[in-house]
Structure formats: structure tokens, C-alpha cells
């Protein structure tokens, strides 16, 4: 971890790296949908091509209408993004559309195992970091489609011992 301090790294980022580090991404095309800091960026060298989209920043993509062709990305990282999108179902459909067959989409949301059911209030709540919703365990139902496999990884951060869920979605053939 040369070049940055552990204080710059969040538990969710370390947990995601634990999952990603077990997979060979050589030559794969990555879409990274946030600025997750140096730990994730250190993984970029594992990929053949990397595109990063930062909301209202560098290469900002509208996830409900992604301006890319079908089957463009082999890997998509969507970390703490969906709760900020009004129409998250449309965003999920778009992510699946631009994901290649056999591609992998990794999704993380804040505390999905705390509540049984998602609480969606239909507006960005300023008391909840502008989130439209707090996902519950039922997020898996929202992610499931006929042509995808959803696997939940419960990962423990090795420093804080905080537990995080990383959803790994693999797009199967149509």
C-alpha cells in the first residue's frame, strides 16, 4: 500500500478489494462508477482498459441512460451509488445492458443487512446523505433477473472488523 495511508481507505473499499483480488481481470474492460480512492485505483493495472465515471465530475454518466453500446464492459464496480438514484430499477437494467455476457457487476450499498425490507421514500433525504432509500435484505430480489446470477459475499474488514456485503452479479447468456 505504498503511496497512501490507511486513513484514506474506507472499510467498504478494503472489503471490495478482498473480493476483487481473488479474480483474474487480465485484459478485461472495467467501468468504475465512483471515486473510491487509491486502493481501488491500485487494482486498475489488473485490467486491460479502465473507464471511470464520477457523478458531476469526470466522465459523469447518467446510469438510467448509459450512453454506451450493449455488452461494452466486462466488469462494473457500483459502490454506494444506487441509493442516490431515483429510478434504481432502470439503472440496474442499464448496468445489465452494458455488461458483457459472462461479465461481472459488483454492487455495494450502505448496510443492506440491517433491515428486512428496503425503505424507499421517493426523494433524496438530506438527513440520509441524499439517499432515496435504505436498502434491506430484499435488495437481492431487485437484482435478480432471468439472465443473471447474484452471489452475496459477506466480507469482514481486516482493520475495523466491520462487515460489508458485496453483491457479485454475473450476466449469463440470454
What are these model-derived regions, one by one?
Residues 86-100, 104-174:
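S-adenosyl-L-methionine-dependent methyltransferase catalytic module, highlighting the catalytic core
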Residues 55, 78, 110-112:
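An acidic- and aromatic-residue-enriched active-site/binding cleft used to recognize and process polar
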Residues 73-77:
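Hydrophobic beta-strand segment of the Class I
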Residues 1-71, 158-174:
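Conserved N-terminal segment of class I S-adenosyl-L-methionine
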Residues 79-84:
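Short catalytic micro-motifs in class I SAM-dependent methyltransferases
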Amino acid at each position: 500500500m505504498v503511496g497512501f495511508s490507511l486513513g484514506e481507505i474506507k472499510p467498504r473499499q478494503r472489503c471490495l478489494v478482498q473480493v476483487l483480488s481473488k479474480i483474474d481481470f487480465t485484459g478485461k474492460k472495467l467501468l468504475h462508477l465512483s471515486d473510491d480512492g487509491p486502493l481501488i485505483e491500485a487494482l486498475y493495472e489488473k485490467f486491460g482498459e479502465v473507464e471511470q465515471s464520477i457523478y458531476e465530475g469526470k466522465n459523469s454518466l447518467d446510469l438510467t441512460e448509459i450512453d454506451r453500446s450493449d455488452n461494452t464492459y466486462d466488469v462494473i464496480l457500483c459502490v454506494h451509488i444506487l441509493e442516490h438514484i431515483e429510478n434504481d430499477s432502470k439503472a440496474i437494467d442499464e448496468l445489465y445492458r452494458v455488461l458483457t455476457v459472462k461479465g461481472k457487476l459488483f454492487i455495494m450499498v450502505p448496510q443492506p443487512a440491517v433491515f428486512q425490507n428496503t425503505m424507499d421514500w421517493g426523494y433524496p433525504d438530506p438527513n440520509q446523505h441524499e439517499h432515496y432509500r435504505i436498502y434491506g435484505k430484499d435488495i437481492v430480489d431487485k437484482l435478480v433477473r432471468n439472465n443473471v446470477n447474484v452471489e452475496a459475499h459477506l466480507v469482514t474488514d481486516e482493520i475495523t472488523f466491520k462487515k460489508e456485503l458485496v453483491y457479485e452479479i454475473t450476466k449469463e447468456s440470454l
